[in-house]
């Protein structure tokens, strides 16, 4: 039986491809020109799943991924993984630093290497491209003089490593997520993360506090919260949230129900195992057993048996 491919941000030689291979998903890769195209391939049935970047340790969230998941047709995150990000400066054989006037790379690459470029290539022009591998391909074709990409892309495109380890901060990592159409959730592991997008009814004083309170009173730690414009009109935003725990945890389920009451829309984006193995600290009074005991007590009250 033919297995559907897994989509990723291509072309060959991107960190997204490296993440796909590291995930060892056992499917053929489907290269896509943009993050949006990779997610569209899943929605349209051309791919079973997609592997896309969602957060950089240097630049924060990847807005193209957040906005597509929050506002496009429903998809859910089923897994995550982290990939070390190490850039190299690649060029055609014989290229030296003094020859470089135009450098191509993904927009996320520039901020991670800005200081190095200012110190070593202060007069160069930065050319933002759809991916670092696309920059390598354009360097091979002569459209740019050099590319910021993974060193592994050099062999793919017949380039040489002009400078390895191009970065401002060592040990940078990017978190990637595996995305699928809605399906039964992965079982909770005790070391889980839940992602969602919360849309306000309207912007008003205390709106963010209302959202945060639903988590705080249940002892749920947020690992990410990011406001993003909805695109509908100026001043209208949604909040992307990552929290510790699984929707099958009583405290997380209760928090989502609370958000449902105070928000215009809550888009559930998945509960899945954390790749770092971090476990949530369950505050006294917020365990599943304590929620169950409280619910049983309320049930007795309603039947006149306190």
Describe each PLM feature range.
Residues 1-306:
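Domain-level signature for soluble enzymes in the chorismate/prephenate branch of the shikimate pathway
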């Amino acid at each position: 039986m033919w297995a559907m491919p897994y989509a990723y941000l291509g072309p060959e030689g991107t960190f997204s491809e490296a993440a796909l291979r590291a995930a060892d998903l056992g499917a053929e890769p489907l290269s896509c020109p943009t993050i949006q195209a990779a997610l569209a391939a899943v929605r349209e049935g051309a791919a079973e799943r997609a592997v896309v970047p969602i957060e950089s340790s240097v630049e924060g969230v990847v807005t193209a991924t957040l906005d597509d998941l929050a506002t496009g047709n429903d998809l859910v995150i089923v897994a995550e993984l982290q990939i070390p990000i190490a850039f190299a400066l690649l060029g055609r054989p014989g290229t030296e630093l003094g020859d470089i006037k135009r450098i191509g790379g993904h927009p996320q690459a520039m901020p991670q290497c800005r200081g190095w470029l200012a110190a070593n290539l202060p007069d160069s022009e930065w050319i933002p491209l759809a991916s670092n591998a696309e920059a390598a391909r354009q360097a091979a074709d002569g459209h740019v003089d050099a590319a910021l990409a993974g060193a592994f892309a050099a062999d793919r495109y017949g380039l040489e490593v002009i400078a390895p380890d191009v970065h401002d901060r060592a040990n940078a990592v990017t978190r990637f997520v595996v995305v699928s159409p809605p399906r039964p959730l992965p079982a909770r592991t005790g070391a889980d993360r839940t992602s969602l997008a919360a849309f306000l009814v309207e912007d008003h004083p205390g709106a963010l506090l209302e959202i945060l309170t639903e988590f705080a009173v249940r002892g749920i730690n947020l690992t990410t919260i990011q406001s993003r414009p909805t695109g509908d009109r100026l001043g209208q935003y949604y909040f992307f949230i990552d929290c510790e725990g699984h929707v099958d945890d009583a405290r997380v389920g209760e928090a989502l129900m609370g958000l449902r009451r105070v928000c215009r829309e809550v888009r559930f984006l998945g509960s899945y195992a954390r790749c770092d193995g971090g476990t949530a600290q369950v505050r006294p009074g917020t365990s599943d057993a304590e929620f169950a005991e409280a619910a049983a007590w309320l049930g007795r009250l309603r039947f006149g048996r306190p």
